[in-house]
UniProtKB/Swiss-Prot annotation:
One of its GO terms (cellular component) is large ribosomal subunit. Belongs to the universal ribosomal protein uL2 family. This is Large ribosomal subunit protein uL2. The keyword Cytoplasm does not apply. Keywords: Ribonucleoprotein, Ribosomal protein, RNA-binding, rRNA-binding. The gene is rplB.
Length: 275
């Protein structure tokens, strides 16, 4: 998708770019597939900040996306490609043969009028979803499940793609976008193709206000705070940390491991930093 670069008519416009959205074919979302989305400004149910630098932003409705692809054997026609403010990828509106409508992530190359389907025995074609055991080696996939029936959890961002590299017993080895190679159960579903909107990574935000519209607040350096607010704060003028770097809560930062390994780490064949 082409990118529109603005002329530097103001300091904020300088170096700003936007997508042209030529792939979008429908502006208003399907009313039956949206629901209200309450803002939480990064707070949990106790009001404690769990995600920093969030708050404000434009009002959004949540689009209900079918990550499970569990309508097996029923063909669906792509009715529209739409914008989704809640994710970097575009979404495709499907009209199933039985009358149901659903949204899926729009893969690269999927067009209005295409026919997609899911389930065992579906053709190896962009937009179709199959169990990993039926997908040939070397095939590019996205929206990958980690547990059968749970719905896709991996490889969902714009331009993301994983590749099937091996099949051993009941597990399939996938090369993920990070370079990590990971075992996933062969009964897990995955969708053929690469997630669309490849040029998302080439867009330049250009100004702080545009980031505020997205719901992101400023990230303040610890050294600019007071010692009450951050271990790096205080001092006259610019001062060195005088200690190994710390998080705002006093934990070691910048390279120090502070978490236990997950039990699921045993499914990692090669870590991303070994690639």
């Amino acid at each position: 998708m082409p990118i529109k670069v603005y002329k530097p008519t103001t300091p904020g416009r300088r170096n700003m770019s936007v997508l042209t959205y030529e792939e979008i074919t429908k502006e208003a979302p399907e009313k039956s597939l949206i629901e209200p989305l309450k803002k939480h400004a990064g707070r949990n149910n106790r009001g404690v900040i769990t995600t920093r630098h969030r708050g404000g932003g434009n009002k959004r409705f949540y689009r209900i996306i079918d990550f499970r692809r569990d309508k097996w054997g029923i063909p669906a026609k792509v009715a529209a490609i739409e914008y989704d403010p809640n994710r970097t990828a575009f979404i495709a509106l499907l009209h199933y043969a039985d009358g149901e409508k659903r949204y899926i992530l729009a893969p690269l190359g999927l067009k209005v009028g295409d026919i997609v389907q899911s389930g065992p025995g579906a053709p190896i074609r962009v937009g179709n979803a199959l169990p990993l055991r039926e997908i040939p080696l070397g095939t590019q996939v996205h929206n990958v499940e980690l547990y059968p029936g749970r719905g896709g959890q991996l490889v969902r961002a714009a331009g993301a793609v994983a590749q099937v590299v091996a099949k051993i017993d009941n597990y399939v080895h996938l090369r993920l976008p990070s370079g990590e190679i990971r075992m996933v159960h062969a009964d897990c579903m995955a969708t053929i193709g690469q997630v669309g909107n490849l040029d998302h990574q080439n867009v330049s935000i250009g100004k702080a206000g545009r980031k505020r519209h997205m719901g992101w607040r400023p990230a303040v350096r610890g050294s600019a705070m007071t010692p009450r607010d951050h271990p790096h704060g205080g001092g006259e003028g610019k001062a060195p940390r005088g200690m190994p770097p710390k998080t705002p809560w006093g934990k070691p930062a910048l390279g120090k491991r502070t978490r236990r390994n997950k039990k699921s780490d045993r499914f990692i064949i090669r870590r991303r930093y070994e690639a």
